């Protein structure tokens, strides 16, 4: 819908308003997502436009532009509405609005994209409003130059907020909110509306705010005395080009690295802004706790970055913009893959092995232990990973999987392998055949739990235990007994990637070297200790002692395959090369590599291919093998105290008999039975890295959902019921502890299946 209104001459100017997207809109219906559209009104001029409607999303993307004629006293109101509800009653379907006064319009135009917070129509409105809208204002008397290709992937990370509260401990923002009366274009006060007003400060105020935020840049900022007069813009830094998209949107390209950004490099980046769309910037930004000196791309020398990784190629578009082709995964990107080494270096600086500076003042309670800092940094890196993966998830469609419990392995294999990787990234919806459960996360968790129990079972021959008394999984070198074993390993890799992508966990523990191989890191002798202690002890003895009069080995080792003793040469003609004091280090190194890669090269590459189809390899660079193990498998140890302290009670209190008896029963359970209880209620035996306070509930929920004990009014002959999507267990008011224990045990051990109430 569009109403251009009347074109006014004289003092009015033509402005192109681009409405790019909205983010984190309020979800007001539990079972339905809104159909958002944006409405743009130039107050007092009769100009009115509406964007297209985007179906079923809280993060709509429009990328539509409108040419507006704005006078000196005009203001622009942008409101977001739910198309499903606008016809029900007056004001229904309102999701938030923002109003730009004339002063703000003049300040914001030609500054690229800005993210504005949505607010209520009236302060007295009870409906929740949250989220942001990303827009840009551009005068139409400019002529754009350069190419028309632009990388839009980094737009949602551009935290160019127009206003920001400056609470205690927070830096000042370059733009500040200033209360103003609600006036129409004539200046008369108007009633009924209370949209957020945006009033830009003067240049002097912005300079002062920048000085307060970062004293180190005082000398680099222009003062009002030496500032250029008029609207003449300073020159761009060396290596930058200003270009314009087909829709008239201005962006900036760093020609040496091929990185594009909506942020003007001539303007100091406000606190909270992530310059550009490079993932390395995002990692550095979040890991440093939102402290923000913008990264100078001029300091990046392409020669110092070295050659491209294997399988990568540099190409350029018709307009001359450089992009990079990954032939390994058949993908393209504008970001130089060599910049991820910089990101990895920044993350390595956070390792706890480095000494931590002590605070100059404050109590001992304020000091941070290395373990605490390490955990905090790991949580931050995990948040960044989740954010990067969420950007890759399609907004529409579902990844629907329907299997039977009896044939869960084969049916899952057939359905997963016929899907494309981009289909697996859609919202996961799992259904067990013959059951009516709706999957809001709990059914998918149970599906993964049951599938892993089958898929990783050594009975199928894909995996084996590392030793007879250490039950850690490794790839079975004799898996080729199954002619389709490589396809099954590809499937296993996809399942692991699917779990990580959708925030679930794999119920199975692999060896530490397996995770190092997934990260592409070399395996060392120390990695052997947790897998094969006896062999590790023997190889360490060889290194630490003189073997000349003791050992009579060659560079040839024996191994058992299907009852036959086979020999393997660690190097060419190894059977004729004796192990001596001079070459024993080479022998140990080759032996360790052979021990972990013996006959599993093809299997591992197939598994890694499936995993990287959903989790790109460069996103794993900041993590080590222990962290990757936590990302894939979560915590397998259940902390009962953490469980108790992060449990929500519904229709009961901590002193209720039901609650006391429940925890009394849990305390009598062994580790295995506690894990079964947790799986019964949440769908998974694994706990998130942050503990029980981070238990995930329904898919798409804004935050975690705590474990919940719900006392219900039901017949005490009934068994407890679990709602895995909400991490809730419903318990009838049993008369005694013995009855609760019996019913709880029966429900956990003897029942399965989903239904809809």
Swiss-Prot record:
Question: Sorted alphabetically, which CDD domains does this protein's record hold?
Answer: C2_Smurf-like (cd08382), HECTc (cd00078), WW (cd00201)
Q: Which SMART domains match?
A: C2, HECTc, WW
User: Residues in domain WW?
Assistant: 234-267, 306-339
Cross-link entry Glycyl lysine isopeptide (Lys-Gly) (interchain with G-Cter in ubiquitin), positions: 381, 383
**According to the UniProt record, what class of enzyme is this?**
transferase
Q: Which residues form the active site?
A: 725
Q: Does the keyword Repeat apply?
A: yes
For this chain, one GO molecular function annotation is: transforming growth factor beta receptor binding
For membrane topology, the record states: Peripheral membrane protein
- Please describe the organ and tissue distribution of this protein's expression: Expressed in melanocytes.
Assembly and oligomerization:
Interacts with TRAF4. Interacts (via HECT domain) with FBXL15 (via LRR repeats). Interacts with SMAD7 and TGFBR1; SMAD7 recruits SMURF1 to TGFBR1 and regulates TGF-beta receptor degradation. Interacts with MAVS; the interaction is mediated by NDFIP1.
Q: What does this protein do?
A: E3 ubiquitin-protein ligase that acts as a negative regulator of BMP signaling pathway. Mediates ubiquitination and degradation of SMAD1 and SMAD5, 2 receptor-regulated SMADs specific for the BMP pathway. Promotes ubiquitination and subsequent proteasomal degradation of TRAF family members and RHOA. Promotes ubiquitination and subsequent proteasomal degradation of MAVS. Acts as an antagonist of TGF-beta signaling by ubiquitinating TGFBR1 and targeting it for degradation. Plays a role in dendrite formation by melanocytes.
Annotated protein name in UniProt:
E3 ubiquitin-protein ligase SMURF1
What is the species listed in this Swiss-Prot or TrEMBL entry?
Homo sapiens
């Amino acid at each position: 819908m569009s109403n251009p209104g009347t074109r006014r001459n004289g003092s009015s100017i033509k402005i192109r308003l681009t409405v790019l997207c909205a983010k984190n809109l309020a979800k007001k219906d539990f079972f339905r997502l809104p159909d958002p559209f944006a409405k743009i009104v130039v107050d007092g001029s009769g100009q009115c436009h509406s964007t297209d409607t985007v179906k079923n999303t809280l993060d709509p993307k429009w990328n539509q532009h409108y040419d507006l004629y704005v006078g000196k006293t005009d203001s622009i109101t942008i409101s977001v509405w739910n198309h499903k509800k606008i016809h029900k009653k007056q004001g229904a379907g309102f999701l938030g609005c923002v109003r730009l006064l004339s002063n703000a319009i003049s300040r914001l135009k030609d500054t690229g994209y800005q993210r504005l917070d949505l607010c209520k129509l009236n302060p007295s409105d009870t409906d929740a409003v949250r989220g942001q809208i990303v827009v840009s204002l551009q005068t139409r008397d400019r002529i754009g130059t350069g190419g028309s290709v632009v990388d839009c992937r980094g737009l949602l990370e551009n935290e160019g907020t127009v206003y920001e509260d400056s609470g205690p401990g927070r830096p000042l923002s370059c733009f500040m909110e200033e209360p103003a009366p609600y006036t129409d274009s004539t200046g008369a006060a108007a009633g009924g509306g209370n949209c957020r007003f945006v009033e830009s400060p003067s240049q002097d105020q912005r300079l002062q705010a920048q000085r307060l935020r970062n004293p180190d840049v005082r000398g680099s900022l222009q003062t009002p005395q030496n500032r250029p007069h008029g609207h003449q813009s300073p020159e761009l830094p060396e290596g930058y080009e200003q270009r314009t998209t087909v829709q008239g949107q201005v962006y900036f390209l760093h020609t040496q690295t091929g990185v594009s950004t909506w942020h003007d490099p001539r303007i100091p980046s406000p606190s909270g802004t992530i310059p550009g769309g490079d993932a390395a910037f995002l990692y550095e930004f979040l890991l440093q706790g939102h402290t923000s000196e913008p990264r100078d791309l001029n300091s990046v020398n392409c020669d110092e970055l070295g050659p491209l990784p294997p399988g990568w190629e540099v190409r350029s578009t018709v307009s001359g913009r450089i992009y990079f082709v990954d032939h390994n995964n058949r993908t393209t990107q504008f970001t130089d893959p060599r910049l991820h080494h910089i990101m990895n270096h920044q993350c390595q600086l956070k390792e706890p092995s480095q000494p931590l500076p002590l605070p100059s003042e404050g109590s001992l309670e304020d000091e941070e232990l290395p373990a605490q800092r390490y955990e905090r940094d790991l949580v931050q890196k995990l948040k960044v990973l989740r954010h990067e993966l969420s950007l890759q998830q399609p907004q529409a469609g579902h990844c629907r999987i329907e299997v039977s419990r009896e044939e869960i392995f084969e049916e899952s294999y057939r359905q997963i392998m016929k899907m494309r990787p981009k289909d697996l990234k859609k919202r996961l919806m799992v259904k067990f055949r013959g059951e009516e459960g709706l999957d809001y996360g709990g059914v998918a968790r149970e599906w993964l739990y049951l599938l892993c129990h089958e898929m990783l079972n050594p009975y199928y021959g894909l995996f084996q235990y590392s030793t007879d008394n250490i039950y850690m999984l490794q790839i079975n070198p004799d898996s080729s007994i199954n002619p389709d074993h490589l396809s099954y390993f590809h499937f296993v890799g996809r399942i692991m990637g699917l779990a990580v992508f959708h925030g679930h966990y794999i119920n199975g523990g692999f060896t530490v070297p397996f995770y190092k191989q997934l990260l592409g890191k070399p395996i060392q002798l120390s990695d052997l200790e947790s897998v094969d202690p006896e062999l590790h002890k023997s190889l360490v003895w060889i290194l630490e002692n003189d073997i000349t009069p003791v050992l009579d080995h060659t560079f040839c080792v024996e191994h058992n395959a299907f009852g036959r003793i086979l020999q393997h040469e660690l190097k060419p003609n190894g059977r004729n090369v004796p192990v001596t004091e001079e070459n024993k280090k080479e022998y140990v190194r080759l032996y360790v590599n052979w021990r972990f890669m013996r006959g599993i090269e093809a299997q591992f590459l197939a598994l890694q291919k499936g995993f990287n189809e959903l989790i790109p390899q460069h996103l794993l660079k900041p993590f080590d093998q222990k962290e990757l193990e936590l990302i894939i498998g979560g915590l397998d140890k259940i902390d009962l105290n953490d469980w108790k302290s992060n449990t929500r009670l519904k229709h009961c209190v901590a002193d209720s008999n039901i609650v006391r008896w429940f925890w009394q029963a849990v305390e009598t359970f062994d580790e295995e039975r506690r894990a079964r209880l947790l799986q019964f209620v949440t769908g998974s035996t694994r706990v998130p890295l942050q503990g029980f306070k981070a238990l995930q509930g329904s898919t798409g929920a804004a935050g975690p959902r705590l474990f919940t004990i719900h006392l219900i009014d039901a017949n005490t002959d009934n068994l407890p019921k679990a709602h895995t999507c909400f991490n809730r267990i419903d318990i009838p008011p049993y008369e005694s502890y013995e009855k609760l224990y019996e019913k709880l045990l029966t429900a956990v051990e003897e029942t399965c299946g989903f239904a809809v109430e």
